Amino acid sequence: MITVNTRENPWREGLTVQALLDEMGFIFRHIIVRVNGEFVPEEAYAQRQIADGDDVQVMHLIAGG
């Protein structure tokens, strides 16, 4: 299991940040991803593996005013 934004989700071998975002429907262009508190740059999404037990945070960036 992994935790995504405080909710438990199933984990599978070979899961990447990009695959997780696609599977969970995170399509908003401006997001920040952290895995176990470590920022993951957008260019690394396809390569960054998510391990069983990881804590993933996905945050949408929204400007207000």
Report each predicted region and the residues it spans.
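Ubiquitin-like/PB1-type beta-grasp interaction modules and other compact soluble beta-rich domains
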Residues: 1-64
